[in-house]
C-alpha cells in the first residue's frame, strides 16, 4: 500500500524516536499554545503579564530572594554530623499488634455488637448474686456438635447475628459463631477455647447468668479442655449418638470427676439414628439405653438417667434440644392433670410399659407394646420426621395442631424438606429451656465451690472472705487484642484497680516460705519483701465473652468468668490474682497450682528463621505462642536451636500457621518431626561408688572433702502407672502427688500395703519428683540424723537437678528409685559453703548411680483410637504393621452401627503421617486420634553405652542399634557431642569418676 513506506517493520513512524515521549509532548504543547494565542487574541497576553507582576510583588512582600529562597522567617541549617544514633530507625516500627483482621472474624466496635433479646443491664445486675451465676464448660469428642450446640443458645439470645446468612438460617450451613479464627473456619474444627456470657431461662421462667466455655474436641487441644474444666462448675459432655461412649468420652468423664466438676450429658445427632442408620424406634431406644449404661459404668456411683434431668437429647443440625421433662410439658401437659405430670415423667424411661391406663415393668401378655420412651417420645418424633421429609403436609398440620398447638405458615410450606423439618422441630421445641433447666438442676453451688477451690489451690490455708482472689486461667488472643481469661472466686474487681499477680510456677515455693515456723518479726519482714517482689498491674479493661465480640463492663463479681486486659505481661501460663488489705490477710491467702493440662507435650520440632536477621521477630512470636497455647513448651538448646514441644501433628500445624502468618510473619525453617525421650535403668547399681569433689587425677593423695554415694534401681511398674496419674494408692488410701509428703504416716502405710515396700524404706522417703523417688538409706551410725537434716534440702534439690536432665542425652529421668547410701561431710568447713557444693555433687552422684544400673532409653508411646467401617479393618491392621513397635490391643464393635472402634499403640517418633495414611487408605471412612494421656514409656531396643553399635550412613539404623542411634543424634542436636556428624563420644561413666577407679571397674568387667 501507499502508506507502508511511512512505517517500519514494527509499526513505528519512520524518522521519529518511538521512546522520545518528551519530544512528542513538547510538540503538542507548542501547538496548543499557538492555537490558544491565535484564537483568544492579545487580551490573553495582558492577563499573563499582570499575573507575573502580581507574583513578583507577593515574593517581595514575603522576603523571598536568592539569599532567602524560603523567606526571611525560615531558618536554613547546614548539618555535617548525624544528630541521631545509627541504631535509631528513621521511621519507628509499630510495636503494638494491629487488630489482625486477616486472621479473625470479630466485631470491634461496641455500637456494632449484636443486640440481645433480653436487657443486658438486667443481666449485669444479676452478677451481684453469685448463686445465680453458673459457669458451664461444653466439652466432648471431635465433631460431636459442641459449637453447634452453642449456636442454638447464641441464636436464641440475640436478635440478629451479623454473620448469619440465609443458608445458615435454613440449616444448609452451620453458623459456628464461637469459631472466630479463620483458621478454625477453614479447617472445620475448633482450635481455641471460646465462650459466651448469656442470660438463660429455665422451665420455671427463672433467669440465670451462664458463662459458657466451648472447648475444642480434638485430643491435640486437650490443654484447652483442661482450662475449661478448671474454670467451670459444671460441664456438658456432648456425645455423638452414632459413635457412642468412645475412649475420649471415658477420659473426659474421669477428668471431670478428678476436677470436682458436675456433669450433664447431651446425646446429640438424633437425626443420624433416623436418617443415616435408619433404625426403627425400638432399636433407636436400645442404642440410647446402651450409651447411658456405658456412661454410668464410668461415673463412680453417680447415676445418670433422662428422668433425673441430667441427660439431654439433641440434634444441633436440626436446631433442637429436649429433656423428657420438657417433652412432656410440650406434648402431654394439656391432657394430663398437673399433679400427675411428675409421676408420668418418671415412668418414661427404662423397662416400663403402658396399656389402657396401666404401667408395668414387664411387657403385657398378648399385646405388642413398646417401652414408654418409645411409645410416648420416639414414635411421635419419628412421625414428625416422616411427615416433614415426605412432604405429607396435611398429616403434619393435623399432628402439630392437635398435639403441639403449632400452626405452619404458608412461607414455611414452600421450604425444601431439610429446612422444613428444621423449622417444624424448632416450632415444637422452641428455645433451649429444657437444656437450661437441666443445667440448673445439676448445679450445686455451695458443694462444688469448696471442692473446686481445694482441688485447684495449694492446701494448707483459707483465703479470707471478701479478699479479691481470682484464678488467671490463660492468655487469649481475642479479636487481635491480648486478654486474660479470669475466674473470680472472691471479692470485687473494678476497672482501674491495681492488683497483684503471682505466676503459678512460683506458688508452691511462695506458700512454703509463708508456712515456715519463724518469728513474727521475721515473718512480717519477709512477707513485706515478697509482696513487693510480686508484680502489680493495673486493670485496663474488663469484658464479657461474646464469641465474636467483647462486651465491656466496669466491674466483675464473685463467680464470674471475665476477660481482663493489662495483666498478661506478669505471668506465663496461669496465675493467682489478688489484692489484700493487710499483712494478716496476706498470710492466709491461698495460691493456685499450675494447671494439669491432662496430656504431656512429647511431639517435638526444631525451628529457626530462614533469614538470621529476623531472629528477634521469631523470639517475640514464640513468646506469644507460649502464652496463647497453654500446653506448649518452648526451649532453647545449647546449640542455639529453638525447640517446640506440642501434643501432636495438628497441634503443631496450627501453631506453626499462627507463628508464620499472624505473629512473626516471616519464613521459618523447621526440622522433621521428633520426640522427647526419657532416661531410666533396667537393673540395680552394681556398686556403691562415692563421688567426691576433691578427686585427684594426677597421682597425688586425695584431699579430705565432701563425698556422696547414691544407688539406683528401676521403680515398680505399678507405682509408675499410679504416679503417671498423679496419685498413689487406691480408694480411701489414695494420696494426691501434690501433697504426698504432707502425710508421711499415710504414705508409709500405702507404700507397705499397696507396693510391698519394707518399713524402713517406706518411712524414709524424702521426695517424689517427675516419676522418680529419693529414699534416705543411710545408717545413723555413719552420719547423725541431725547433721543430715541440715543438708536435706540441698540433697533433694540436687536430686531434682539430676532427674530433670539425665547423663545420657540430657533428657528427663523417669521411673528410677534413688537411694542415698552415704554422705561424708568434713567438720572443719563452713555449713553455708558446704550447702553450695552439695547440690551439684548430689546431681553427679545420681548420674553415677544411673550409669551403674544398666541405663536404658525410653520413648513415648501414643495411644491411638480409630473409628472405621468394619470391612476396612484389614487396612488398619496393615498400616499398623508398617510402623515399628505399633500394635492393636482391642477392637470394639460400636453397637447398632457398621463401625468398629480400634484401640492401639504407636511410638510417637513413628506416628508422623499415620492419620494421613489412614484417611487416604480408607477413602475417608477411617478416623483416628492419637493421645498421650496415660504417659506410656517403652524401652528403645539396643544398648545406649555400646560404642560398637552399627549405625549406617543415610540408612535406617538396625533395631538393635536404635537406642544408641537416638542417643547420639539427640546429643549432637543439643550440642553435647561436638565431634561432628559421625562422632561417637557418647555417655560414659568415665566422665564422672576417677580414671583409676574406672580402670579397675573395666578390669573386673563391670563396664565395657
UniProtKB/Swiss-Prot annotation:
GTP binds at residues 140-147, 214-218, 268-271. The modification Phosphoserine is found at residue 85. Residues 504-536 are annotated as: Disordered. One of its GO terms (molecular function) is GTPase activity. One of its GO terms (biological process) is spliceosomal snRNP assembly. Residues 131-338 form the tr-type G domain. Residues 268-271 are annotated as: G4. Gene3D superfamilies: 3.30.230.10, 3.30.70.240, Elongation Factor G (Translational Gtpase), domain 3 (3.30.70.870), P-loop containing nucleotide triphosphate hydrolases (3.40.50.300), Translation factors (2.40.30.10), Yeast translation eEF2 (G' domain) (3.90.1430.10). InterPro entries: EFG_III/V (IPR035647), EFG_V-like (IPR000640), EFTUD2_N (IPR031950), P-loop_NTPase (IPR027417), Ribosomal_Su5_D2-typ_SF (IPR020568), Ribsml_uS5_D2-typ_fold_subgr (IPR014721), Snu114_GTP-bd (IPR044121), T_Tr_GTP-bd_dom (IPR000795). Residues 214-217 are annotated as: G3. Its main location: nucleus. Residues 140-147 are annotated as: G1. Residues 524-536 have a biased composition (Acidic residues). Component of the U5 snRNP complex required for pre-mRNA splicing. Binds GTP. PANTHER family: 116 KDA U5 SMALL NUCLEAR RIBONUCLEOPROTEIN COMPONENT, TRANSLATION ELONGATION FACTOR-RELATED. Belongs to the TRAFAC class translation factor GTPase superfamily. Classic translation factor GTPase family. EF-G/EF-2 subfamily. This is Pre-mRNA-splicing factor SNU114. It comes from Saccharomyces cerevisiae (strain ATCC 204508 / S288c).
Amino acid at each position: 500500500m501507499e502508506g507502508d513506506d511511512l512505517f517500519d517493520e514494527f509499526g513505528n513512524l519512520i524518522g521519529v524516536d518511538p521512546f522520545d515521549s518528551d519530544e512528542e509532548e513538547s510538540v503538542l504543547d507548542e501547538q496548543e499554545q499557538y492555537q490558544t494565542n491565535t484564537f483568544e487574541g492579545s487580551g490573553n497576553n495582558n492577563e499573563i503579564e499582570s499575573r507575573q507582576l502580581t507574583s513578583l510583588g507577593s515574593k517581595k512582600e514575603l522576603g523571598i530572594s536568592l539569599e532567602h529562597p524560603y523567606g526571611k522567617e525560615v531558618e536554613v541549617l547546614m548539618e555535617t554530623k548525624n544528630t541521631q544514633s545509627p541504631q535509631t530507625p528513621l521511621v519507628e516500627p509499630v510495636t503494638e499488634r494491629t487488630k489482625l483482621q486477616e486472621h479473625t472474624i470479630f466485631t470491634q466496635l461496641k455500637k456494632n455488637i449484636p443486640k440481645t433479646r433480653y436487657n443486658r443491664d438486667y443481666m449485669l445486675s444479676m452478677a451481684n448474686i453469685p448463686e445465680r451465676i453458673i459457669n458451664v464448660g461444653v466439652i466432648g469428642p471431635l465433631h460431636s456438635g459442641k459449637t453447634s450446640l452453642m449456636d442454638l443458645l447464641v441464636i436464641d439470645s440475640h436478635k440478629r447475628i451479623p454473620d448469619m446468612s440465609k443458608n445458615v438460617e435454613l440449616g444448609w450451613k452451620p453458623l459456628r459463631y464461637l469459631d472466630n479464627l479463620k483458621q478454625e473456619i477453614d479447617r472445620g474444627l475448633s482450635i481455641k477455647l471460646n465462650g459466651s456470657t448469656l442470660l438463660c431461662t429455665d422451665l420455671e421462667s427463672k433467669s440465670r447468668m451462664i458463662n459458657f466455655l466451648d472447648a475444642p474436641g480434638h485430643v491435640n487441644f486437650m490443654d484447652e479442655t483442661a482450662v475449661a474444666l478448671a474454670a467451670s462448675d459444671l460441664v456438658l459432655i456432648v456425645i455423638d449418638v452414632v459413635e457412642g461412649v468412645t475412649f475420649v468420652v471415658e477420659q473426659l468423664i474421669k477428668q471431670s470427676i478428678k476436677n470436682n466438676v458436675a456433669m450433664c450429658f447431651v446425646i446429640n445427632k438424633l437425626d443420624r439414628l433416623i436418617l443415616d442408620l435408619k433404625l426403627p424406634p425400638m432399636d433407636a431406644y436400645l442404642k440410647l439405653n446402651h450409651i447411658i449404661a456405658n456412661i454410668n459404668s464410668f461415673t463412680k456411683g453417680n447415676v445418670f438417667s433422662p428422668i433425673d434431668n441430667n441427660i439431654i437429647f439433641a440434634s444441633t443440625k436440626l436446631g433442637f434440644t429436649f429433656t423428657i421433662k420438657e417433652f412432656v410439658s410440650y406434648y402431654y401437659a394439656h391432657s394430663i392433670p398437673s399433679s400427675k405430670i411428675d409421676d408420668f415423667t418418671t415412668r418414661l424411661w427404662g423397662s416400663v410399659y403402658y396399656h389402657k391406663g396401666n404401667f408395668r415393668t414387664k411387657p403385657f401378655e398378648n399385646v405388642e407394646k413398646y417401652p414408654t420412651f418409645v411409645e410416648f417420645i420416639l414414635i411421635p418424633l419419628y412421625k414428625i420426621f416422616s411427615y416433614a421429609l415426605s412432604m405429607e403436609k396435611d398429616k403434619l398440620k393435623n399432628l402439630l395442631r392437635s398435639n403441639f398447638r403449632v400452626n405452619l405458615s404458608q412461607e414455611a410450606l414452600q421450604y425444601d424438606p431439610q429446612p422444613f423439618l428444621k423449622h417444624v422441630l424448632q416450632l415444637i421445641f422452641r428455645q433451649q429451656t429444657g437444656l437450661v433447666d437441666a443445667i440448673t438442676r445439676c448445679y450445686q453451688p455451695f458443694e462444688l465451690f469448696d471442692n473446686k477451690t481445694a482441688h485447684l489451690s495449694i492446701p494448707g490455708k483459707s483465703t479470707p472472705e471478701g479478699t479479691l482472689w481470682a484464678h488467671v486461667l490463660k492468655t487469649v488472643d481475642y479479636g487481635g487484642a491480648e486478654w486474660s481469661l479470669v475466674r473470680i472466686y472472691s471479692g470485687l474487681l473494678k476497672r482501674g484497680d491495681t492488683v497483684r499477680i503471682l505466676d503459678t510456677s512460683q506458688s508452691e515455693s511462695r506458700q512454703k516460705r509463708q508456712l515456715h515456723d519463724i518469728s513474727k518479726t521475721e515473718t512480717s519482714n519477709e512477707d513485706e519483701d515478697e509482696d513487693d517482689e510480686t508484680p502489680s498491674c493495673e486493670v485496663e479493661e474488663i469484658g464479657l465473652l461474646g464469641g465474636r465480640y467483647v462486651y465491656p463492663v466496669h466491674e466483675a463479681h464473685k463467680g464470674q468468668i471475665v476477660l481482663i486486659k493489662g495483666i498478661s505481661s506478669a505471668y506465663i501460663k496461669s496465675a493467682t490474682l489478688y489484692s489484700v488489705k493487710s499483712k494478716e490477710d496476706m498470710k492466709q491467702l491461698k495460691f493456685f497450682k499450675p494447671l494439669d493440662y491432662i496430656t504431656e507435650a512429647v511431639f517435638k520440632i526444631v525451628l529457626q528463621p530462614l533469614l538470621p536477621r529476623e531472629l528477634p521477630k521469631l523470639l517475640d512470636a514464640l513468646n506469644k505462642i507460649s502464652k496463647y497455647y497453654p500446653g506448649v513448651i518452648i526451649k532453647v538448646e545449647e546449640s542455639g536451636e529453638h525447640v517446640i514441644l506440642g501434643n501432636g501433628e495438628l497441634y503443631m500445624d496450627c501453631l506453626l500457621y499462627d507463628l508464620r502468618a499472624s505473629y512473626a510473619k516471616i519464613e521459618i525453617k523447621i526440622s522433621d518431626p521428633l520426640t522427647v525421650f526419657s532416661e531410666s535403668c533396667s537393673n540395680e547399681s552394681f556398686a556403691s561408688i562415692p563421688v567426691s569433689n576433691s578427686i585427684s587425677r594426677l597421682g597425688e593423695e586425695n584431699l579430705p572433702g565432701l563425698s556422696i554415694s547414691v544407688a539406683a534401681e528401676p521403680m515398680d511398674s505399678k507405682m509408675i502407672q499410679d504416679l503417671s496419674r498423679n496419685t498413689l494408692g487406691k480408694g480411701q488410701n489414695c494420696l494426691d502427688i501434690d501433697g504426698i509428703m504432707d502425710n508421711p504416716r499415710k504414705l508409709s502405710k500405702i507404700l507397705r500395703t499397696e507396693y510391698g515396700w519394707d518399713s524402713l524404706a517406706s518411712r524414709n522417703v524424702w521426695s517424689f519428683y517427675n516419676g522418680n523417688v529419693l529414699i534416705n538409706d543411710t545408717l545413723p551410725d555413719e552420719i547423725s540424723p541431725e547433721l543430715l537434716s541440715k543438708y536435706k534440702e540441698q540433697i533433694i534439690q540436687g536430686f531434682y537437678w539430676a532427674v530433670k536432665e539425665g547423663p545420657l542425652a540430657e533428657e528427663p529421668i523417669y521411673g528410677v528409685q534413688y537411694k542415698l547410701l552415704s554422705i561424708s561431710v568434713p567438720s572443719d568447713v563452713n555449713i553455708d559453703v558446704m550447702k553450695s557444693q552439695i547440690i551439684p555433687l548430689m546431681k553427679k552422684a545420681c548420674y553415677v548411680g544411673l550409669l551403674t544400673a544398666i541405663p536404658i532409653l525410653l520413648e513415648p508411646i501414643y495411644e491411638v483410637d480409630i473409628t472405621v467401617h468394619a470391612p476396612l479393618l484389614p487396612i488398619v491392621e496393615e498400616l499398623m504393621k508398617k510402623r515399628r513397635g505399633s500394635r492393636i490391643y482391642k477392637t470394639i464393635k460400636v453397637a447398632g452401627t457398621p463401625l468398629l472402634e480400634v484401640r492401639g499403640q504407636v511410638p510417637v517418633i513413628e506416628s508422623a503421617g499415620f492419620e494421613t495414611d489412614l484417611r487416604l487408605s480408607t477413602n475417608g471412612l477411617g478416623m483416628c486420634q492419637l493421645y498421650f494421656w496415660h504417659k506410656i514409656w517403652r524401652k528403645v531396643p539396643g544398648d545406649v553405652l555400646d560404642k560398637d553399635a552399627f549405625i549406617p550412613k543415610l540408612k535406617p539404623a538396625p533395631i538393635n542399634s536404635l537406642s544408641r542411634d537416638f542417643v547420639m543424634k539427640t546429643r549432637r542436636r543439643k550440642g553435647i557431642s561436638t565431634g561432628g556428624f559421625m562422632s561417637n563420644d557418647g555417655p560414659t561413666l568415665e566422665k564422672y569418676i576417677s580414671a583409676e577407679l574406672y580402670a579397675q571397674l573395666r578390669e573386673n568387667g563391670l563396664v565395657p
